[in-house]
Curated annotation (Swiss-Prot):
It catalyses: carbamoyl phosphate + L-aspartate = N-carbamoyl-L-aspartate + phosphate + H(+). It is an enzyme of class 2 (transferase). This is Aspartate carbamoyltransferase catalytic subunit. Carbamoyl phosphate binds at R55, T56, R105, H133, Q136, G264, P265. Heterododecamer (2C3:3R2) of six catalytic PyrB chains organized as two trimers (C3), and six regulatory PyrI chains organized as three dimers (R2). Keywords: Pyrimidine biosynthesis, Transferase. InterPro entries: Asp/Orn_carbamoyltranf_P-bd (IPR006132), Asp/Orn_carbamoylTrfase (IPR006130), Asp/Orn_carbamoylTrfase_sf (IPR036901), Asp_carbamoyltransf (IPR002082), Asp_carbamoyltransf_Asp/Orn-bd (IPR006131). Its EC number is 2.1.3.2. GO terms for cellular component: cytosol. GO terms for biological process: 'de novo' pyrimidine nucleobase biosynthetic process; 'de novo' UMP biosynthetic process; amino acid metabolic process. PANTHER family: ASPARTATE CARBAMOYLTRANSFERASE, ORNITHINE CARBAMOYLTRANSFERASE, MITOCHONDRIAL. The gene is pyrB.
Length: 308
């Protein structure tokens, strides 16, 4: 098993499937009256979040606690970081405290890789800038496999703001490794073709959403990250929704078995309408639940829970 999880490129097909299989076992814990396992008792997991997050931080906290680990939540706001403490100084502090694993979210791309050089424990990337978010890709893959029974050969359309999406990058890497066929869809300014080619050469690019829907097993809608862009990327929110938003009419062009995903948070009415988000095809709530199971599996395997 790998020591850190920093990128979708860190896992080969065997490792990814081991994580997904372990997550399926962890999912059974959620149905128990007592939702706890003693696997990581005595271990310390630190959630080191330099960016605001609700879903991801709570998901990791729930995952660690269900494995009986001790959890320390660190928020940059109100901490020594606001007084100028560097990431390295924070890392050395965590090292001195004996952290067994550090889950880090940081606005700077590459920050988790630097952190991994400074601590002895395992580092899990919970999102770094516009770079990657590997556990989101794993939970997305788990959701696809749970709903559709396989990953190899699936046609997955990833739609929207690919340029600023760490989720898209990790999904391209992981899904390609697991044999899915990925097509990126969106306005030309939001599809970084050169970066995509470097990540996974077999990834397709299309600028017409309506053309890819009939052949898609999975449609993954991405949030338009307006906080990371100016108004030059597309004319208006209304025009974006008209060209690339998934509404009920477009959803009905999908194959009968196809599912709709979104990593959250959503801009309802922009990239996805409430009708679609709340439909039986939508896996959005499932993705949240599956995130806890997948992150339990990641922490369990990284910290040697299988050897305890």
């Amino acid at each position: 098993m790998i020591r850190h999880l920093l990128s979708g490129a860190d896992v080969d097909a065997g490792t990814a499937n081991r994580i997904l299989d372990t997550a399926a076992e962890m999912a059974t814990v959620a149905g128990r009256e007592v939702k706890k396992l003693p696997a990581l008792r005595g271990r310390t997991v630190v959630n080191l979040f330099y960016e605001d997050s609700t879903r991801t931080r709570i998901s990791f906290e729930a995952a660690a606690k269900r494995l009986s680990a001790d959890v320390i939540n660190f928020s940059a706001k109100g901490s020594s970081v606001t007084k100028g403490e560097s990431l390295k100084d924070t890392a050395l502090t965590l090292q001195a405290m004996g952290a067994d694993a550090v889950v880090v979210r940081h606005p700077a791309s590459g920050a988790p890789h630097r952190l991994a050089e400074w601590v002895d424990g395992s580092v899990v990337n919970a999102g770094d800038g516009t770079h990657e978010h590997p556990t989101q890709a794993l939970l997305d893959a788990y959701t696809m496999r749970s709903r559709l029974g396989r990953l190899a050969g699936l046609s997955v359309a990833v739609v929207g703001d690919v340029l600023h999406s760490r989720v898209a990058r990790s999904n391209v890497l992981l899904l390609s490794t697991l044999g899915a066929k990925v097509t990126l869809v969106g306005p030309p300014p939001l599809i970084p073709v050169d970066i995509v080619a470097a990540l996974a050469p077999g990834t397709a690019v299309c600028y017409d959403l309506d053309a890819v829907l009939p052949q898609s097993d999975v449609v993954m809608m991405l949030r338009v990250q307006r906080e990371r862009m100016n108004d030059s990327y597309f004319p208006s929110a209304r025009e974006y929704a008209r060209r690339y938003g998934l509404d009920g009419t477009r959803m009905r062009r999908l194959p009968e078995h196809a599912i709709v995903m979104h990593p959250g948070p959503m801009n309802r009415g922009m990239e996805i309408t409430p009708e679609v988000a709340d439909s039986p095809r939508s896996t959005i709530v499932e993705q949240v639940a599956n995130g806890v199971s997948v992150r339990m599996a990641v922490l369990y395997l990284l910290l040697g829970g299988n050897n305890r």
